[in-house]
Amino acid sequence: MAAGPCETCIVKRMTVLATALAVALGGYVVADAYDVTPGFLTTRPTESEALPYPSVSSASAPETLPSWNADAKVDNAAVTSALGSLAASPEAHGHVSAVVADAASGKTIAQLEPDTPRAPASNMKIVTAAVALRVLGPETTLKTTAKIEGKRLYLVGGGDALLGSGGANPAAVNGRAGIGELADKAADAARKAGVTEVVVDSSLFSGPQRNPSVTGGNASFVMELRPLAVNQSRNSGKAYTANPDIQAGQAFAKELAARGVPVSGAVRRGQAPKQAREAASVESAPVRDLVDFMLKHSDNTTAEILGHLVAVKSGEPASFEGAGRATLADLKKTGVNASGVVVDDNSGLSPKNRLSASLLNEIMKKVASCDGCALESITSGFPVSALDGTLDDRMRGSAAAGKVRAKTGTLSNAASLSGFLETKSGRLLTFSILIDGIPDGSFTSARHAIDSFVVSLAGA
């Protein structure tokens, strides 16, 4: 991204961001809908009907949406004082790094140990979002394919772990493409070929299915990583179940049988031979929507899958190590200070990850000044304070309610928050806060310290 974007572009982008915050405060969020390389990625636009304008009954939008005020002032002394209070707060417990900057000019207002690498928890997903949007492209979709060789039908995974169990749902991210939809498309060819067996091809991803650094209870927060799953292999209790690709294959075999394809026997794994012919395919929601889903819900599985796909696109093995190398390489290409950065996974679950507040804030500034670039969609995925996602129950009843779009991060010993906020004067700020080294059992207190700091910023 070129340095020093034009002032008009910045004002335009700031207005979009501020309006997005105002709209969120009014009670609804406008969602972008887009589509999108050969193989498991496709650049062909997907066909779907226009969706109705979103609305909710619990709140209404204000009659006039305020635009960003380019002449608004910020009390820099108040920001500096608030940061000092955060650093001295007994609630913070751990080691604090933070950066606050003016979104329009990019100038830093206050900072504390900005370049110290710290455990980012789920703020790692901000990096994953930026890298996935740049490397894969916001309009790219993930392709699940049915291929036939002899009497075998191969279900080839392309990275979509959010397949629906039935037909397609163009209004959803989870379930945009469906196993039933694929069976509808493949059934005729399967019957003509005399298919009797379903084989699952999960060869797109290599290496371990679980990151060895993610242990204990944290391992239960992410799916066994395969490039194919129905609803991320969650059961009715929302827990992840084993062998998600095999489960998807079993569901597909059942759908084929219901359409007169006499499949039988156990579904197994195997790589489709080169001569296998494609019978049908379905496509996921575009990467920009997957990024939104990941950020809004802090979805670890989507984060790891996007990282593995970045590795494939970058010529690295589709493993946790390959994803880490590809992610770091792309970061360095953007010119940010990546000193001390460690990318051990793409979700933030690994305690080995290290990012700096300055790096995260640099990404925020690039998003803020972006006019039509790949990163522009990141803000729509950030939760809104006191409204939705992982911020729905935070900062309620405060000056920051509905004024913050940010990504949360929580581990037992680390807490983080990075994003954008609108001050009481109408000025837009970028910020990043990382706290690590938090004693066991104290992360809730550390999150409260972060929230108190952000509320102070909103009043500056």
Language model regions located:
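N-terminal export and membrane-targeting signals
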Residues: M1-A24, A242
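C-terminal region of N-terminal signal peptides and the immediate post-cleavage residues
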Residues: G26-L65, T141
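Beta-lactamase-like hydrolase cores
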Residues: E49-P117, A183-G194
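Mid-domain, small-residue-enriched loop/turn segments at the edges of structured enzyme/sensor domains
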Residues: H95, Y154-G180, A187-R226, S233, ...
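Small-residue-rich helix-loop
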Residues: Q111, V312-A460
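A small/polar active-site loop signature that marks catalytic segments
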Residues: E224, N231-E376
